[in-house]
Structures are given as structure tokens and as C-alpha cells.
Amino acid sequence: MQTYLVGGAVRDALLGLKVVDKDWMVVGATPEQMLAQGYEQVGSDFPVFLHPKTKQEYALARTERKSGKGYTGFICYSAPDVTLEQDLMRRDLTINAIAQEKDGRLIDPYNGQQDLDNKILRHVSPAFVEDPLRVLRVARFSARFAHLGFTIAPETIALMQEMVVAGELEALTPERVWKEWEKSLSTENPEVFLTVLRQCGALKVVMPEIDALFGVPQPAQWHPEIDCGIHTLMVAKQAAELSPNKVIRFAAQVHDLGKALSPKDDLPSHKMHCKDGLKPIKALCQRLRVPNDYRDTALMVCAQHTKIHHANEMRPATFVNILDQIDSWRKPERVIQLALCCRADARGRTGHENDAYLQADILLAAFDAAQQVDVKPIVAAGFKGKDIKEQLAIHRTAAVELAIKPLQSKA
């Protein structure tokens, strides 16, 4: 019975990155032997055990054979005669197929270290095509390691394209698609996840609402990049630079879905995209079972972002109306979410990446002033019911006017 550290822990250590989780592989053991040593079995599909003290995962070496469509159609074989090399062969990428012995010696039968040195994401074997989830995983790894200069091997991209054409991705469940997308939102370059999916044709399958933006023109006067899809990728990049918050990053990626629905006769204008975008956002979130906080923030940004772009000339009462609409009094975090997404939107344009965005400062100043208005004096003055709400709006509008006037004069 031999134990090896495998997968991401070995890879990240070799890259000089922080190792978060450690996964172990056990060769030459049976489930009975593991249980006898105090390990707790947790895997139902294949033998995985938790260490009695560290609670880290220990999996018995196994092989996998395709038995059906999708990512669940596998027959797993786990026995003491399965070798280390056989287990590593079933893994997706060479950089994830390196094992380490307790003394630190590396076992690297598929040249993962060489690919790490050359910054290449390359599949281990032709069996890569048997699991459609790997298309999304490679896209996510590409997003995670893009800042280090990693690229995908041409032959791996070719396999991913073949899998898309073969219809393999249609077997993916909504939960698995969302899980990979959500993980990509935590990477250094979330826009690369979408770029890779677009490159291999998968974006049209798993996120057709985003894919539909590519090729749709915008006015060159405001959008030198012209293409709505390119703009979306640029906004996604800007949002990632502005905030680590996954909800904000998601909202930025889907805020312009309505532009794909603009009438062709109106192009390159998109006058109704803020309203038109609500339906595809709802459809996308329902299909992929996106959590409600992601969905609601995305809908808010979609509905309001064009208004905020005109904050320089917006009337105080309009600010108060918007703050009411987004439920900012109960959910103050929405104001900063909206401000950051709008800043990302404004900067997600060719040549405007470093523009100042005073509109965000005006919005935040308006909210800060309105929030400080106390309702108690209004109630004490004898107002009741709807009259309280009306008076509160009047007082908030007056406070907002004082707060934003100096900022608007700078615009």
C-alpha cells in the first residue's frame, strides 16, 4: 500500500501558488484495509476515504471506461492491481497528472512538468473526449492561469471542438455548467473562460444568450470595438480588475444580453436593450439554476446601467427613484454593485480602459446623502401612511441635490 499526493496540490506547488486542498491516491489497497486503518468511506461511485485525523481525501487508484453519453457514463475499476500510471492516465490535463511521493520525488509519466514549464494546457490521452465536462474545466483552467501566460495546446482545442460537434456537451446538467462558470468568476481572468468556450464552439451550446452577442454591431462613436461580444469580454475583464466579488463579475458579463435582440433595422442602435435584456437573463438563470442573488443583481444592472451613464445630468428626484427601484434602503450593497458594473461597462471599450467615471461617484454620493435622511422627524410632524413616503422622497431629493451639485458641475 503506497500513498501519493496528486493533482492540483502538486501542480500549484510547482507553480509557486498557495496549496489549498490536498488530494491523495492510494495504490495497492482495498476498501477493507482503508476502513481497518480508521478511514471513513464517503465515495459512492468509487472508493474515496477521509483520513481519520486530517479529513483529507484519499482515493483508491482506479481506471475509468466510457459506458454511455455524458460525464456520468463511466465504469470505474478500482483494485490493488491498478497502477499509479494507470490512474494518472485517466486525468484531464498533463499538469494535473503529476504525483508526489512522501519523500518529495515526483512521478510524471505524461510530461506534466514540461508542460508547466512551457505553460501549456494539454490533454493526457485521447480518452479526454469521453468526459464533456472537461471542455468547461479546460476553459476554467485557462482563465485561472492566463495571467501566468498559459495557453491551450492546439491539439487539445481540436479535441474540444470535436466534442462540441459530436453533441457531447448536451449531456451536461445545468448544475455542472453553472458550477464551472461560477468557479471561473473567481479566477484572475474570467473573460478567458468565455473566450475559450467561444473558440471551441461550446459557448453557443451552454450559454447561447452570450454567444448571440458576437457579430452584433454597436455605434463606433461610443464603442470603437463595435462588436457586442467583444465589448462583453472587455467589460468582464474590467469588472474582474475592479472587484473580486463573483456576483458583480457575473452581472457585468450578462448586462448587455438585450443587444442580441435589437431589431436588425435599428442596428447599430440598441435603444431598448436595457428592457429587452431582462428576459434572456431570466431564461439563462432559470436554465442553469443560477442563485437568486446573482440573478437579481444582474437584472438590476441590466435595467439601470444606461441611466447611470447619464448621472452627470440626472435630476435629484431620478436618483431617488432609482434608489427606490433597486431596494437600496434594505440592500445598500446594491449601490456599489451597480456603480462598479457601470464603471466596468464604461471602461470596457477600446481606448477607454482607463477613463475616469465620475458617474459612479455621483451615484454613491447621492445614496450616501439620501440614506442619512431620518424618517423620525417626518413621523413626529404627524405624517402618516403614504404621506410619510412622499415626505421622505422630498427630503431625500433635497439632500441628494446638495450632495451631487458640486460633482455634476465638474462633469
From Swiss-Prot:
It catalyses: a tRNA precursor + 2 CTP + ATP = a tRNA with a 3' CCA end + 3 diphosphate; a tRNA with a 3' CCA end + 2 CTP + ATP = a tRNA with a 3' CCACCA end + 3 diphosphate. It holds the Pfam family PolyA_pol. It comes from the Bacteria. Mg(2+) binds at D21, D23. CTP binds at G8, R11, R91, R137, R140. The keyword Transmembrane helix does not apply. GO terms for molecular function: ATP binding; CCA tRNA nucleotidyltransferase activity; cyclic-nucleotide phosphodiesterase activity; magnesium ion binding; phosphatase activity; tRNA binding. The keyword Transferase applies. Residues 228-329 form the HD domain. ATP binds at G8, R11, R91, R137, R140. Magnesium is required for nucleotidyltransferase activity. Nickel for phosphatase activity. GO terms for biological process: RNA repair; tRNA 3'-terminal CCA addition. Keywords: ATP-binding, Hydrolase, Magnesium, Metal-binding, Multifunctional enzyme, Nickel, Nucleotide-binding, Nucleotidyltransferase, RNA repair, RNA-binding, Transferase, tRNA processing. Its EC number is 2.7.7.72, 3.1.3.-, 3.1.4.-. Its cofactor is Mg(2+); Ni(2+). A single active site specifically recognizes both ATP and CTP and is responsible for their addition. HAMAP family: CCA_bact_type1, CCA_bact_type2. Belongs to the tRNA nucleotidyltransferase/poly(A) polymerase family. Bacterial CCA-adding enzyme type 1 subfamily. Catalyzes the addition and repair of the essential 3'-terminal CCA sequence in tRNAs without using a nucleic acid template. Adds these three nucleotides in the order of C, C, and A to the tRNA nucleotide-73, using CTP and ATP as substrates and producing inorganic pyrophosphate. tRNA 3'-terminal CCA addition is required both for tRNA processing and repair. Also involved in tRNA surveillance by mediating tandem CCA addition to generate a CCACCA at the 3' terminus of unstable tRNAs. While stable tRNAs receive only 3'-terminal CCA, unstable tRNAs are marked with CCACCA and rapidly degraded. Comprises two domains: an N-terminal domain containing the nucleotidyltransferase activity and a C-terminal HD domain associated with both phosphodiesterase and phosphatase activities. Monomer. Can also form homodimers and oligomers. This is Multifunctional CCA protein. It comes from Photobacterium profundum (strain SS9). The lineage of its organism: Bacteria, Pseudomonadati, Pseudomonadota, Gammaproteobacteria, Vibrionales. The gene is cca.
